[in-house]
Amino acid sequence: MRFFCARCCSFGPEMPAVQLLLLACLVWDVGARTAQLRKANDQSGRCQYTFSVASPNESSCPEQSQAMSVIHNLQRDSSTQRLDLEATKARLSSLESLLHQLTLDQAARPQETQEGLQRELGTLRRERDQLETQTRELETAYSNLLRDKSVLEEEKKRLRQENENLARRLESSSQEVARLRRGQCPQTRDTARAVPPGSREVSTWNLDTLAFQELKSELTEVPASRILKESPSGYLRSGEGDTGCGELVWVGEPLTLRTAETITGKYGVWMRDPKPTYPYTQETTWRIDTVGTDVRQVFEYDLISQFMQGYPSKVHILPRPLESTGAVVYSGSLYFQGAESRTVIRYELNTETVKAEKEIPGAGYHGQFPYSWGGYTDIDLAVDEAGLWVIYSTDEAKGAIVLSKLNPENLELEQTWETNIRKQSVANAFIICGTLYTVSSYTSADATVNFAYDTGTGISKTLTIPFKNRYKYSSMIDYNPLEKKLFAWDNLNMVTYDIKLSKM
C-alpha cells in the first residue's frame, strides 16, 4: 500500500518540523525504494513538490489525527536533539579551549622551569665560588698564623736565652761591682783620686762620674746613656746608691697606652714589677679587669707592645677570686685581696701557686671603708722604694687611713701607722718613698693630690698638686718605683703619669 505525503512534503514557509518530516519521508523513500516525486502548481499558481512512499508495514494510511501526533512527536524529538546538539557544541568548545590552554601551558612551562633551573644553578655556582674563595682565604690565614706562631716561638726561645745570658752577666757584674767596692780594683792612670780600700760608701766611688758609668756599662753590656739618665724629678740618678727619693712636687698629663674592649674593663688594675725576677723583665705587664663577682683572670704580656696591642702571652686563673683594684706585682708575685675577706694573698706567678695568706687584723672589707668611688676598695696594696705596703682602715681608727708595712715573703705586718685622713673622703692613694699621697676626686678633670702623710715623721700636710682625670673615672692609681711613674685605670683606659720629686 502506498502512503501519500503531498501535504507534509510540500515546500513552503512551514515549520522546521515539516522539513524534518520531509527528511523522514526521504529516508522512508530510500528504505522502500518505491518513492514517487511529483511537481505541480497549486490553485494560486505556486509550485509544489509532492512525493509518495509505500509504507513497508501499514496496509492503509492512518487518520489525520494520527499523522499530527507523529509530527508533534517528531518536533519534540527535534527540539531535544537540538538542545543536546547545543550542549554538545558547548562541551566541545570548552574542551577545545581547555585543550588549547593545556597546549600553551605545556609549551610555556618547560621554558619557565628551565629558566628557574638556570637561575638556581647560577646561584649555586656563585655560592660555590664564594665558598672556595673563603676556603682559600682561611687556608692562607691559617698558614700565616702557623708561620707567625713559629716565628714567635723562635723569638721567644731567643729572648729566653738572651734573658738567661743577661741574668748570668748581671750576676757576674754584681760580683765584679762588689769586688770593686772591696777595693780589689787596681788604680788606673785616669783615676782622679785615690780610693780608700774596703770602703762601702757609694759617694767614695763618685758613681755619678761618667768614667764609672762607662765601666759599669762595659761590665753589664748596657749603654751608659741608659744607666746615667735624668730622673723625672730633674736630677741625676744611677742604679746604685741613689734611690731617687724625694717629695712629690708635680704630676704630668696622662698618657693612654691601652683601652679595654668591653664593659668588664670599666675599672681594673694593671702593673709592672718594679723588682722583676726571672723569667720576667721590666717590660712584662699584667692586667686584670675587675668588673664582676668572680674575678680570676690575670692577663700577662711579655712585651709592652703586646700589651698595647692587646695580645696576652699567658692568662693566669687565680685559685680564688680577688676583690677590687688594689692588687700589685712585686718580686715575681701577685699580691691581692681575696674576695669578701680581709685576707691578703701572695700568688707566685712563675709557679702559679699560692705562697702565703694573711688576714689584716681588724681591716674593713667589702664596702666597710672604701675610697670615695666605692668598688669595695677597702684594702689597697702598694709598692714603693721601701717595699710592700697595705692601705686600709679599721673600726678602731674610725674610718681613718691605716698604713702597714708588709713582709713580702710571709705577709707579716712589720710596722703600722694611723693617719688623720678619712679614707672615704679621698678617691685613691699611693705611696712614694715612704710617704702616703691621696687624690681628691676620681671624676673631676681638675683633681688634686691633696694630702701627704710621711711615715718617717708621722706628720701629714695638705697639698694642691694638679692631677688630671682625663676620662673622669679613675678607679686605680699606683706608683712604680722602678719607672718613677704613676699607673692608673681611668674609665676603661690604662694610663701613666710622669712625676717630679724634689731631691732630698
Curated annotation (Swiss-Prot):
Q: What is the effect of changing residue 352 to K?
A: In GLC1A; benign
* Biased segments, Basic and acidic residues type: 122-131
Q: What is the effect of changing residue 57 to S?
A: Loss of higher molecular weight isoform
**Impact after mutating residue 423 to E:** In GLC1A; heterozygote specific phenotype
Q: What is the effect of changing residue 471 to C?
A: In GLC1A; uncertain significance
Tissue expression per record = Detected in aqueous humor. Detected in the eye (at protein level). Widely expressed. Highly expressed in various types of muscle, ciliary body, papillary sphincter, skeletal muscle, heart, and bone marrow-derived mesenchymal stem cells. Expressed predominantly in the retina. In normal eyes, found in the inner uveal meshwork region and the anterior portion of the meshwork. In contrast, in many glaucomatous eyes, it is found in more regions of the meshwork and seems to be expressed at higher levels than in normal eyes, regardless of the type or clinical severity of glaucoma.
Q: What is the effect of changing residue 473 to C?
A: No effect on protein stability
Result when mutating residue 244 to V: In GLC1A; uncertain significance
Where mainly located?
secreted
Q: Which GO terms describe its molecular function?
A: fibronectin binding; frizzled binding; metal ion binding; myosin light chain binding; receptor tyrosine kinase binding
| Impact after mutating residue 9 to S | In GLC1A; uncertain significance
Q: Which GO terms describe its biological process?
A: bone development; clustering of voltage-gated sodium channels; ERBB2-ERBB3 signaling pathway; myelination in peripheral nervous system; negative regulation of cell-matrix adhesion; negative regulation of Rho protein signal transduction; negative regulation of stress fiber assembly; neuron projection development
Q: What is the effect of changing residue 380 to N?
A: In GLC1A; uncertain significance
- Which InterPro entries does this entry report, sorted A to Z? Olfac-like_dom, Olfactomedin-like_domain
Consequence when changing residue 481 to T: In GLC1A; uncertain significance
Variant or mutagenesis effect after changing residue 499 to S: In GLC1A; uncertain significance
Effect seen on changing residue 360 to N: In GLC1A; uncertain significance
Here the disulfide bonds are 245-433
| GO CC annotation, single | collagen-containing extracellular matrix
- Annotated site residues (Cleavage) in this chain: 226-227
Assembly behavior: Homodimer (via N-terminus). Can also form higher oligomers. Interacts with OLFM3, FN1, NRCAM, GLDN and NFASC. Interacts (via N-terminus) with MYL2. Interacts with SFRP1, FRZB, FZD7, FZD10, FZD1 and WIF1; regulates Wnt signaling. Interacts with SNTA1; regulates muscle hypertrophy. Interacts with ERBB2 and ERBB3; activates ERBB2-ERBB3 signaling pathway. Interacts with SNCG; affects its secretion and its aggregation.
What is this protein's record name? Myocilin
Q: Name its species.
A: Homo sapiens (Human)
